[in-house]
C-alpha cells in the first residue's frame, strides 16, 4: 500500500510595504517546518493577484496584512481578498498606536480574524522572541481551524516552536458531559476570549439587554492602547457602557469592566463592596491579561452567583479558572466549536467537564436572559 503524500505546508502570504518587516516575518515563519511563505509582497493589489492564482496543492491559508501601503492599502484590499476566498484567514499586523488600533478594529469588522502588534524594538531579542511566539501560535491556530473547516489535513508543527498551549483541540467526537446549572439568579458575569473574541463579544453584548444589577467582567487577550479603543467600541455598539478597569474602581451593576492591556484584572471584596484590582503579576498561560486570575478572584467574591462564559480563543486560558468557579458553585458556559474562530479556550473548558452548557454564539445571549430572569439554561 502506498503511503499517502504529506499534507501541504501551511501557506502564508506576507504583505507589508516595509522590507524590514517582510524580512522579519518571513524569517520567523520559514523557520517553522510546517510553514511556507508563498509570497512576500508590498501592497494589497499584489496580494489580490497572488490569491487569485493560488492552487489547491499550494493553498494560501493565512495572509499577514499591513494597513498602510501604497497602491492599495490593507483596509481596501481586505474585502476583495475575502471575496476571492472567504476561507482565507487574515491577520492584520499594525503598530501600537491609537490610530493603528482603530484601523485594526475596522479590519476586524471587515472580516479579519485577528490582529497582532508589530514588535516595538526589532533590535531587542526579548521583544522579537515574544513577537515570534505570538505570531507562530496565531498563524498555526487559524490555519488549522481553516483546514479543519474545509476537511483538509494539516501538517503538525514542532512542539518546541509554540510555547503557548495547543492553540486548538481535535474535533469533538462525543458530546462532553454537562453539569447541572446551579439554582439562583447570577450576580455577576465573567467573559474570557482571545482570537475571534472582539467579534464574538460584540455580537453577544448587542444581543444582551442591559441589566442594571449585573456587572460584567471581560478579559480579552489584547495589548495596551487597543483595550481602551475596544472599551469605547463596546460602549458605542451595545447596550452596555464599558470602561477599561483601573485600580480601586468600585464595581456597579449595568457596567462592563475590561481588563487593561498588559495588566491582570482582579476583583476583591471591601467594606464598600467589590472593587477592581489590577496587577502586573507574571503572565499566566503566556498571557497578561489572563482569564484564570480574573476567574479565581471573582469566584472568591461572588461564589454561586458567578456565571462565566468562555468565547472563542486559542490556548487553554480559562480552563483552570473555570474549575475554581465550579468549585465555588458557580456556572460555566462555553461557545461551541462550529461558531468559534478557534476552539482552543472554549474547547479546553468543554472537555474539562465543568460546563453547564456548550452553545452556538447566537444562543448564548438568549440563555443568559433566561438565567437572569430565573429560568433554566
Positions of the model-derived regions?
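Conserved acid/base catalytic micro-environments in cytosolic active-site loops
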Residues: 2-14, 18-34, 45-46, 50-53, ...
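Short beta-strand elements in bilobed, periplasmic/extracellular small-molecule ligand-binding domains
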Residues: 36-38
